């Protein structure tokens, strides 16, 4: 009985415990909901309080704030520290002497007017960039800037952060094109130093002191990739710049850049080498193939000129000589020398052939004016053609024969006039009837080496014609004067040719004549000399410019 009673009591107690537990759980749910509502309500009230506190705090901070005055006005100089984060190197231009850089610029200073009490539960406030218009900010600028702009996607990339102790952090993201004075004497095997120069525009060193935020003054340089360059290092500098308005603090970030020559090897150097080697092909072409060798030489020369023009257009117009100019000029010299080599071969070959054939060119007698040219025609009418052929020749024998012929002609004319008074003349009135024909053509008898014989027979009983004799005398006198002037010109040409011949003989005595028996030897030697000289030039060129300090 006792056991059964004890079991009943145990079961009843267990049942009551379970029922009480269930009721307790059901009773706590409404209590938890009310607690969460109370917490959310408290957070909302607290947030509203903080918003109101922050708004009132900013209003209180700006209540008596004068943005025209720097922090610590009238006291010690304001310490302004800054750091830079490099986002990217966009481009570098040798023509414009500048480079484009995207960076984050952060500036830090302390403004006592922006402090607030520690009792306010706000330790730091991050504000938009527009708030910077309500407080004093440094008048920082980039001294070597050409063109800069702030990014505005999706909002204006400016940031302002204020701490409880009055410390201000002011940051912005900008892209700037900065000038970079380059020394291109070793281009494209050169190294350059490009800088970012930061300076205060209006505040002197007595009002604002600028310092780098060491040890983390510059970030992101190792991850930056520069087109056609390799960043070998960087360092920061600070200096004081004195101008007419005072002394200003300047912070400089110097990038040490070395140009990558791979682009120029494939763009300039390798084509030049191939063109020079192409010019050597003419040494294996027969020297009688004039059109082929000349066309090849001219093509290589024009190609080198085109490459040189393209390189000059990608560089600024500077007065000093660059290393790439030396290489292009030497390649042009090698190509042009290959063309001159064929000129030497051609001259040697055809000069020898002409020497074997003999003969030479005769010098023409140049008339001084129109009157002299007319006198030459008149002389040909009255002087035998064999003698006239000798006038333009440089030999003294023919000139003397011409003079003797003219004197004989004058004597014959006088005899003919004397005989005409007693004997009748023939039909022809010319004093030299056997030598002339109709149409002013010279008789073939004039080619005889003997002097001409004039006829003295005339018709008996015929009366002389005075008018004809008068015209004949006048014509012969004028022709004789012109013939003498013509002979004077012939003597001048003879003396000129003799003088030039004498100079040539003296020059040949002084300068030894190089005679090549086989013109193919010039091509054979050129096949070796040209490549060897070009290889030696390249060894000296690359050894010097790869080792010389830029």
Swiss-Prot record:
UniProt topological domain (Cytoplasmic) ranges: 345-527
Disulfide bonds: 180-194
GO MF terms, alphabetically ordered: chloride channel activity; extracellular ligand-gated monoatomic ion channel activity; GABA-A receptor activity
Keyword annotations from UniProtKB, A to Z: Cell membrane, Chloride, Chloride channel, Disulfide bond, Glycoprotein, Ion channel, Ion transport, Ligand-gated ion channel, Membrane, Postsynaptic cell membrane, Receptor, Signal, Synapse, Transmembrane, Transmembrane helix, Transport
Glycosylation site positions: 26, 32-33, 45, 53, 193
Transmembrane regions listed in the UniProt entry: 265-285, 292-311, 324-344, 528-548
Similarity comment text for this entry: Belongs to the ligand-gated ion channel (TC 1.A.9) family. Gamma-aminobutyric acid receptor (TC 1.A.9.5) subfamily.
Name of the protein this chain belongs to: Gamma-aminobutyric acid receptor subunit beta
Organism the protein comes from: Caenorhabditis elegans
Taxonomic classification: Eukaryota, Metazoa, Ecdysozoa, Nematoda, Chromadorea
Gene (name only): gab-1
């Amino acid at each position: 009985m006792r056991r059964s009673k004890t079991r009943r009591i145990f079961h009843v107690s267990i049942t009551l415990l379970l029922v009480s537990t269930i009721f307790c759980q059901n009773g706590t749910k409404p209590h938890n909901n009310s607690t969460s509502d109370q917490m959310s309500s408290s957070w909302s009230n607290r947030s509203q309080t903080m918003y109101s506190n922050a708004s009132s705090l900013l209003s209180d901070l700006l209540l008596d704030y004068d943005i025209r005055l720097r922090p610590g006005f009238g006291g010690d100089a304001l310490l302004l520290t800054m750091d830079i984060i490099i986002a990217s190197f966009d481009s570098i231009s040798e023509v414009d002497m500048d480079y484009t850089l995207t960076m984050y610029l952060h500036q830090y200073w302390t403004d006592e007017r922006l402090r607030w009490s520690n009792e306010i539960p706000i330790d730091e406030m991050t504000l938009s960039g527009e708030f910077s218009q309500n407080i004093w900010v440094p008048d920082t600028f980039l001294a070597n800037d050409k063109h800069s702009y702030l990014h505005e996607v999706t909002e204006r990339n400016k940031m302002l952060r204020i701490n409880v102790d009055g410390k201000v952090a002011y940051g912005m993201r900008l892209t700037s094109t900065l000038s970079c004075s380059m020394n291109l004497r070793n281009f494209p095997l050169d190294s350059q130093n490009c800088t970012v120069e930061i300076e205060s525009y209006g505040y002197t060193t007595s009002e604002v002191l600028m310092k780098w935020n060491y040890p983390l003054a510059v970030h992101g340089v190792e991850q930056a990739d520069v087109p056609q360059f390799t960043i070998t290092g960087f360092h920061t500098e600070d200096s004081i710049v004195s101008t007419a308005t005072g002394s200003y603090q300047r912070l400089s970030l110097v990038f040490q850049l070395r140009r990558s020559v791979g682009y120029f090897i494939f763009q300039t150097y390798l084509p030049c080498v191939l063109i020079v080697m192409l010019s050597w092909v003419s040494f294996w072409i027969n020297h009688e193939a004039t059109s082929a060798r000349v066309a090849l030489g001219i093509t290589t020369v024009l190609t080198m000129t085109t490459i040189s023009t393209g390189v000059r257009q990608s560089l600024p117009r500077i007065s000093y000589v660059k290393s790439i100019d030396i290489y292009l000029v030497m390649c042009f010299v090698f190509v042009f020398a290959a063309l001159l080599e064929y000129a030497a071969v051609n001259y040697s070959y055809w000069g020898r052939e002409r020497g074997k054939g003999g003969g030479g060119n005769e010098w023409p007698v140049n008339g001084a004016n129109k009157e002299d040219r007319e006198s030459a025609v008149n002389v040909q009418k009255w002087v035998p053609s064999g003698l006239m052929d000798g006038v333009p020749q440089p030999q003294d024998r023919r000139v003397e024969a011409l003079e003797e012929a003219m004197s004989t002609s004058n004597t014959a004319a006088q005899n003919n006039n004397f005989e005409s008074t007693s004997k009748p003349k023939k039909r022809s009135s010319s004093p030299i009837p056997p030598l002339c024909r109709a149409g002013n053509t010279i008789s073939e008898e004039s080619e005889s080496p003997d002097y001409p014989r004039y006829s003295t027979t005339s018709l008996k009983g015929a009366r002389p014609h005075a008018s004809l004799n008068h015209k004949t005398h006048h014509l012969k006198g004028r022709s004789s004067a012109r013939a003498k002037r013509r002979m004077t010109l012939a003597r001048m040409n003879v003396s000129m040719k003799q003088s030039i011949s004498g100079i040539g003989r003296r020059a040949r005595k002084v300068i030894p004549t190089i005679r090549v028996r086989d013109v193919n030897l010039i091509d054979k030697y050129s096949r070796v000399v040209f490549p060897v000289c070009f290889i030696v030039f390249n060894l000296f060129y690359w050894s010097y410019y790869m080792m010389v300090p830029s």
